[in-house]
Amino acid sequence: MEIGELRPLKEMAVKPGSVFRMRFYPQDGIVPKDSSDTSRDKYFIILGKDNKGGYVALSLINTAINENLRQRIGAFQYQISSSDYEFLNGKDRFVDCYDMKEVASERIIEQGDYAGLISETDLKAIIKLVNDSPIVSVAKLKRYEIYYVD
């Protein structure tokens, strides 16, 4: 039996550092790969939860850095190694720390597939980059209790 099939375990897994895979749509701010597609499956890392637990803040995991945006967002992309994480399927990827998405916890529990857990070292580095991002507001960081502690 997998964790994705067990709601109570999945609820416990919705916490900072957990990685899930879920389908996103244009209304989520995610552009499908092909013009004929209406959605896109993405891996993401949970960074924090609001104090009521109804929403989480997350960073998306991308296969590559968008070349059209590299100059603006490149410094806020954190590379994670496939040798450290089985769910990466043998390919290093990038965590987008330039921006973070806000998603209902219930949606992740209902639709997300648990993939794994990011190491404390990687999570700390990701949180630092998110805190340094010029577009993530202090109010949003406070709402989700995403603080970088050296």
Predicted regions and their residues:
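Compact nucleic-acid interaction/catalytic patches
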Residues: 30-41, 46-84
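Mixed-charge, Lys/Arg-rich low-complexity intrinsically disordered regions
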Residues: 1-14
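C-terminal terminal-subdomain/extension
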Residues: 77-150
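Structured loops at beta-to-helix junctions and adjacent beta-edge loops in soluble globular domains
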Residues: 23, 61, 98-100
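Short, charged beta-turn/beta-strand-edge "cap" motif at the junction between a beta-strand
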Residues: 25-29
